[in-house]
Amino acid sequence: MAETLSSLQDLKAATAVPTEEAPVYAQKLDAFGRAYATGKRKDAVARVWIKPGSGKVTVNGRPLDVYFARPVLRMILQQPLGVAKRVDQYDLMVTVAGGGLSGQAGAVRHGLAKALVNYEPELRSALKKEGFLTRDSRTVERKKYGKKKARRSFQFSKR
């Protein structure tokens, strides 16, 4: 019996697949000690710079509550900081262009999550699990000829 156990353990050790460790990501900072990333959503493109601070957020040179007046949009923007438990620990400087306010808020969220990973690589797994590092590829479907919109047909009359 002892022989069988030892041979089984030898077999298990021989066939064991070595576990691969997760790759170690390096911190990426610019000359001013800031982390930079771009985020996209629909037609909006956001460029985000973060640095340690008191939680001050400027979007296109304006305060956050002025640019994104609706609380829902501000909540979308703050989600990566909440998941990472870093609320009011970073100052954000954002430039965003294109699309509407909802797409812009989503683009800033995507860029902020990527910038957080560039500053603190250990946050990558938590942010990836929540889906903040994934580009939302849903865009407006193009209009087709012979149709009123992308899928809506013209009104049909039998007689």
From Swiss-Prot:
GO MF term (any one): RNA binding
Keyword terms: Ribonucleoprotein, Ribosomal protein
Entry annotated with the keyword Ribonucleoprotein: yes
Disulfide bonds: none
Pfam families: Ribosomal_S9
PROSITE patterns: RIBOSOMAL_S9
GO cellular component, one term: cytosolic small ribosomal subunit
Keyword Acyltransferase set for record: no
Matches recorded under InterPro entries: Ribosomal_Su5_D2-typ_SF, Ribosomal_uS9, Ribosomal_uS9_bac/plastid, Ribosomal_uS9_CS, Ribsml_uS5_D2-typ_fold_subgr
Domain of life from the UniProt record: Bacteria
Any Gene Ontology biological process: translation
Stated family: Belongs to the universal ribosomal protein uS9 family.
Record-given protein name: Small ribosomal subunit protein uS9
